[in-house]
Amino acid sequence: MKTLLLTLVVVTIVCLDLGYTLTCVTGKSIGGISTEECAAGQKICFKKWTKMGPKLYDVSRGCTATCPKADEYGCVKCCKTDRCNK
C-alpha cells in the first residue's frame, strides 16, 4: 500500500511538472543578450522590433505576463517555450 501511494505521488509530481520556470532570452540588440528564468506570473517570452530609421530596428527581448503591443512601425513576437524568442 505504501509503495502504491509513493508511486502515485511521484507520478503526480512528474505529470504536473511542479516548479517549472520559463527561460527567455533577454536584453537589447545594442547591449547584448543573455538568458534568464522568468519571475512568477511571467509565462510569455517576447521579441520586439522598434523602427529607429530606414532599415534600422532596435530589438528587445524578455519575459512578460502579457504580450506587449507593437509600435506603429514595429512588430512583436510572443511565445511560450524556453528560449523561443532568440
Swiss-Prot record:
Main location: secreted
Location of the protein in the cell: Secreted
InterPro entries listed in its UniProt record: Snake_3FTx, Snake_toxin-like_sf, Snake_toxin_con_site, Toxin_cobra-type
Keyword Cell membrane: no
Signal peptide, first to last residue: 1-21
Disulfide bonds: C24-C45, C38-C63, C67-C78, C79-C84
Membrane-spanning ranges: none
Similarity comment: Belongs to the three-finger toxin family. Short-chain subfamily. Aminergic toxin sub-subfamily.
Protein name (record): Synergistic-like venom protein
